[in-house]
Amino acid sequence: MNKIVIQNPRIINEGRSFIGSVLVEGDKIAAVFEGEVPGNVRAEANQVIDATGKWLIPGVIDDQVHFRDPGLTHKGDIGTESRAAVAGGVTPFMDMPNTKPQTTTIADLEWKFNRAAEVSRANYSFFFGGTNDNMDEIRRLDRSRVPGLKLFLCSSSGNMLVDKKDSLERIFGEAGMLIAIHAEKEEVIRRNIQYYTNLHGEDLDISFHSKIRSEEACYQCSAEAVELATRLDSRLHILHLSTEKELSLLSNHLPLSEKKITGEVCVHHLWFHDGDYAQFGNRIKWNPSIKTIEDRAALREAVNNNTIDIVATDHAPHLPEEKQGSCLKAASGGPLIQHSLITMLELAMEGRFTYEKVVEKMAHMPAELFRIDRRGYIRPGYYADIVLIDPEQTWTVSKENILYKCGWSPFEGYTFHHGVWKTFVNGELAYGDGEVNDAVRGKEVRYL
């Protein structure tokens, strides 16, 4: 069995930060030491990595990605985007069902598992898509293999709108598993489109996006979902929260293990605000839209006070030409997974979060919320999903170092002040010194 000692990094884990060492045996963490690793342990290792001056954290768990496989692979695929993931310190991902075909049958879910086993450099998992008429398929799901159901409560990329009241009642009442939602009120969006096109015509610029996909569209839909989940005693997870108003629907009075209603925020809503549309244009067009600087401040505070439980990406690559055109025509979404951890570390450097909070929201809490088997922490017996950070690396995002298949990033030209030095996936070096190890394959994530 391969034995690796990672010696003398600063370990950031479970709210603590200390100089220590980690012993990896095979695909698991065998021991965690404070201070120097014992000499006999070091002597028995096949490899000793001197990580002095580096930081060691558990691999990031991203609960919302769109890797575009199958059917949309001109934008990205499981192979290419998992390469970007490990380069960004993401070791397990949860992929969304709005592909072609949509992941709304057991057969299509199995196709994704088989494809990921062949090509994914990171550990993999897939949400199952709920529709107006696939309750029989939902009942057949193996709950240990999927993180939950994904419902689109508005028309967004992929057109998987679930809009029949009886279908929603049945899913929330009978699914017996976590339900993750994209919450924007379809009627409000359509009304806003009608209003602004009547005033300004069809060729609306990007500044109208946050007016069309407005605060009220988000709040109304989230509030209705919370009411339904509360009434039917369901587990509800609201994805990509974008407004201060929605935060009133969530609570930080209970530990995560007791929460039935939880929330996620994405890095772009913590980084950008609507004043950035003038500079970045359609590159920062997402659904839900980027909102005000006040919303951004409230979302940051909600991460710090635990009203928001998870930070993720909604990684959704499109080709540059698909991002062109008016507000109503340009594709929504963008590639983020290679830069999500680094972005959060940059915000921590600015004093917005502690580094311990970044690790909590990107690794620990996803593992807890989704009840993932032995991932998300630096603990003996857990899978050795480990990221080593260089806290002194200064580098600029450019086309030369972007790994997304789509070839661009909203962070192009930005200089970051931390870098991912090495990423281990199940004890194997998946990324190191700027190179992806394409021989590594991730494992299927399991749920308890």
Which residues fall in each region the model found?
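C-terminal cap of metal-dependent C-N hydrolases
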Residues: 9, 326, 380-446
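Divalent metal-coordination and catalytic microenvironments
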Residues: 9, 22, 27, 53, ...
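Histidine-rich, glycine-flanked metal-binding segment
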Residues: 1-5, 10-58
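His/Asp/Glu-enriched, well-ordered alpha-helical/loop segment
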Residues: 203-224, 228-233, 283, 304-311, ...
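A glycine-rich helix N-cap at a beta->alpha junction
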Residues: 114-130
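Histidine/acidic residue-rich metal-binding segments in metalloenzymes
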Residues: 136-311
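Metal-associated gating/positioning segment near the N- to mid-region
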Residues: 51-119
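Short catalytic-loop micro-motif centered on adjacent basic/acidic residues
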Residues: 95, 125-128, 235-240
